[in-house]
UniProtKB/Swiss-Prot annotation:
Coiled coil (residue ranges): none
Assigned protein family: Belongs to the ATPase delta chain family.
Provenance organism: Rhizobium etli (strain CIAT 652)
Database matches in Gene3D superfamilies: N-terminal domain of the delta subunit of the F1F0-ATP synthase
Keyword ATP-binding carried by entry: no
Membrane topology category: Peripheral membrane protein
Lineage summary: Bacteria, Pseudomonadati, Pseudomonadota, Alphaproteobacteria, Hyphomicrobiales
Protein name: ATP synthase subunit delta
Length: 188
């Protein structure tokens, strides 16, 4: 069952929640542990289609979402600020915005460290060598250290889509084929 695109709606919510979590973690010197828990939870989201559907679905009650999030957090070894944060998000029925909250937290943390964060979409998982090479290329362009967040999307067919701040570089095969298709329509 497709879920409506709520990306525009959630960006403000996600940024506010992420900012609150970051400020709390910074105040208590727990940014690294929150980041580790956040990464662990993101890995679970990436690996589980059921968890993605659960997070995005408005069908479950706040109580059911809270119980599930508590169980998932305990099983994954997520505790402290991030576990409490997940409970608040579930209680407030904002789990649908969780992926945006994770992205926003990473951006805030990277900015705090003087780094630039880049979102990378690839058709296939990147090797460590490819990630290192991409970071070096982005550092040479931006002049700052770059942290990258890689998302795998087979629908782009090949190449990469790289988003750094308000700039986007799209070298995906899908875009190149679309451009070629348009060019052929104009000729024909």
């Amino acid at each position: 069952m497709p879920v409506a695109d709520t990306s525009q709606l959630t960006s403000g919510v996600a940024e506010r929640y992420a900012s609150s979590l970051f400020e709390l973690a910074l105040e208590h010197g727990a940014v690294d542990s929150v980041t580790a828990d956040l990464d662990r939870f993101q890995a679970m989201l990436d690996e589980s289609a059921e968890l993605k559907r659960f997070v995005a679905s408005p069908v479950f009650s706040a109580e059911d979402q809270l119980k599930a999030i508590v169980a998932i957090s305990e099983r994954a070894g997520i505790s402290g600020f991030f576990a409490n944060f997940l409970k608040v998000v579930a209680r407030n029925r904002r789990l649908f915005a969780l992926p945006g909250m994770i992205r926003a937290f990473r951006l805030i943390a990277a900015n705090h460290r003087g780094e630039i964060s880049a979102e990378v979409i690839s058709a296939h998982a990147l090797s460590q060598a490819q990630e290192t090479e991409l970071k070096a290329a982005l550092k040479s362009v931006t002049g700052k250290d770059v942290t990258i967040s890689v998302t795998v999307d087979p629908s782009i067919l090949g190449g990469l889509i790289v988003k750094v701040g308000s700039r986007q570089i799209d070298t995906s095969l899908r875009t190149k084929l679309s451009t070629l298709k348009l060019a052929l329509k104009e000729v024909g």
